[in-house]
Each structure stands twice: as C-alpha cells, then as structure tokens.
C-alpha cells in the first residue's frame, strides 16, 4: 500500500485495516460540543441539534427525498443493529428499514396464523384505511396508507432473500467472521448489490469509562477484521468506487486515563474515516497536538461538514433550501462545508 504519513494512529489491533490505508482518508480534527450520548448520536446522524418537537431526517431519507427511490421492491435505507429513528419531517416511506440482527434477517416475516386469516385481516385493515382516507384526505394519511401497502408487498416478494445472509457461500461468511458486526457488514454488502442506497451498521460498546483500556482494545479488535474484509470485498466486486464508506462515532475519548482506568467523553477532538465513492485515499486530513487535545493543523471539521461532504458525494443539492413541517427551512447537512481535500 505504501507508507501514509499519520497512519501511526492505527494501533496493532487494526493491522488488517492498515493494509487498506491507501483507500482511506482520515479526518483527524472532527469536533462538536456535546458530550452526551443521545445528543451526540442525534447530531452525528442528522447534522442537527436535538430539539423538542422537531424530528430531523438522516442522510438516507434526504437522499430519497432528492433522488427518489431506487426500487419499489426494496427499501432505500436500512439500519442494521440500531433502532429506527423514523423519517424525520419527511413522509413515512422515507423512514429507514430496521434490522436488529443480521443473522436473523427480517423477523416475523411470515404470519404466525393461517394465511387465509392473515389475508382477511389485511383486507379489513385496508377497508378501514380507505374510509379514514375519505374523511381525512390529507397527504400524510395517503402516504402512510401507501407505505403500508408497499410493506405488505415487500414481505410477500422474493426480494426479501437479499436480507438472508445464510444464502451466502461458506467462504464469504467465513471472510466476515461470526460477530454481530461482521454479519451486519456482510448483509450490508448484499444490500448494496441489491441497490439499497444508504446502509448503517452499528458496533456498540465503546463507552469505556471503567477499565476502558481493555474494553477499547477489545472493541478495536472486533472492528478490524470485519471492516477490512468489507473494504476488500467491495473493492474486489467493483462496488467501492460507487460506494462511500464512512466510519465514525458520536465523540472521542479523553487522551488522559481517569482514576477508574478508563477514558471519559471528549467531543472536542476525534476522527472519522472515509473510503470509496470518489474519496482520494491514502491521506490524513488535519492534525491534533502531541497530546491529542487540541487542533494543531487544518480546519476543525464539524458533523455538519461531514454530512455535507457525504451529501455532495451522493449528488444532493447541498445549497437547496426545503421546508419541513411548520414551514421551517432546512438544508441537507445543515449548511456545513464540503471537505474538498477528501476528493483532491
């Protein structure tokens, strides 16, 4: 791969990922202001601060809004190993499709009652829906009814096989390993082949405020092999050039170890990794000081900048204003700046 200045940030636990260093652009000066998990995750997922009474969409929903759905037989966005944040202020069909465990695929796919009874209940529900639409002819009501009907068709189609990683060859399953995260990445690759536009795979358990050194090394080891396998697999199949891969977190960890042998929340400086999708790999963007506390080189990169950069790579109009619920104006990326060096 050749030497890349700054790749020393990778520890021995990520030696497999280091082999793909020429594909990676590492953002060293990510930063934000909140050190609370819920608020930090929300900000990193949406580029907006959490506000009572307002729900903001994630990037997959933004992409569907601007570019339309790629397929009526598959969801446009899938979240693996995470909850379901909903569509934000977009219609219901813009919500991501949640998969709790990739090994189990789509749970409760088949009705646990006789099929005739199930179909009869669906028909009754549709009758009630049509009556409701008649008396409340709102766009939101129609969108929900359409979303419900499309979901039923999806569950009854052969496209659901894309969610079954057991259909993969043993060699492919072995490549990704048996961890929940590895299986999630394998499912992500299958979904990319079926034209799903936006996929998120979650690896939790990084909250190492107690005995954080051991926990951090363990989690890093769990990340390394599956993520390296994912990048290599996408590259071999010709998918990496058209797929931007993003590895990030809600905030960093203090360089200083606390009295409990762990690291506390540190939103001021952390890193993100980008690959594929037009990214110019083999570079490190920005630099913190020798203690990892303050930015020493390059611009501070905000969650808004990261979102805007991804949106730009997707071809979304980052300068176009739209109006959400209540007529409030919004921009994808919340008016961040494109990190041009990522593509240079």
Name each region found by the language model.
Residues 1-344:
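Ligand-binding pockets and gating/stacking loops
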């Amino acid at each position: 791969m050749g030497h890349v200045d700054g790749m020393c940030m990778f520890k021995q636990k990520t030696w497999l990922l280091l082999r793909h260093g020429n594909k990676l652009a590492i953002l060293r000066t990510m930063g934000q202001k909140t050190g609370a998990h819920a608020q930090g995750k929300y900000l990193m997922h949406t580029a907006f601060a959490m506000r009572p009474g307002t729900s903001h969409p994630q990037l997959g929903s933004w992409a569907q809004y601007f570019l339309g759905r790629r397929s009526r037989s598959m969801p446009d966005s899938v979240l693996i190993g995470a909850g379901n944040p909903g569509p934000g202020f977009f219609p219901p069909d813009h919500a991501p499709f949640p998969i709790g465990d990739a090994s189990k695929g789509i749970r409760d796919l088949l009705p646990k009652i006789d099929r005739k009874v199930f179909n009869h209940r669906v028909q009754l529900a549709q009758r009630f829906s049509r009556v409701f639409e008649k008396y409340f002819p709102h766009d939101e009501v129609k969108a929900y009814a359409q979303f419900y009907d499309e979901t039923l068709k999806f569950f009854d189609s052969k496209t659901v096989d894309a969610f079954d990683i057991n259909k993969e060859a043993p060699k492919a399953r072995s490549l990704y390993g048996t961890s929940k995260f590895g299986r999630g990445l394998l499912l992500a690759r299958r979904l990319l082949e079926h034209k799903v536009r936006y996929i998120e795979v979650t690896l939790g358990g990084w909250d190492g405020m107690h005995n954080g050194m051991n926990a951090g090394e363990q989690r890093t080891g769990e990340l390394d092999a599956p993520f390296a396998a994912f990048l290599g697999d996408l590259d071999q199949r010709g998918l990496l050039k058209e797929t931007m891969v993003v590895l990030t977190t809600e905030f960093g960890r203090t360089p200083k170890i606390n009295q409990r042998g762990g690291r506390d929340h540190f939103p001021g400086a952390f890193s993100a990794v980008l690959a594929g999708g037009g990214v110019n790999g083999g570079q490190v963007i920005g630099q913190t000081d020798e203690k990892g506390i303050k930015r020493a080189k390059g611009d501070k990169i905000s969650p808004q900048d990261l979102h805007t950069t991804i949106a730009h790579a997707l071809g979304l109009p980052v300068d176009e204003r739209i109006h959400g619920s209540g007529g409030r104006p919004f921009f994808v990326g919340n008016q961040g700046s494109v990190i041009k060096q990522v593509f240079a």
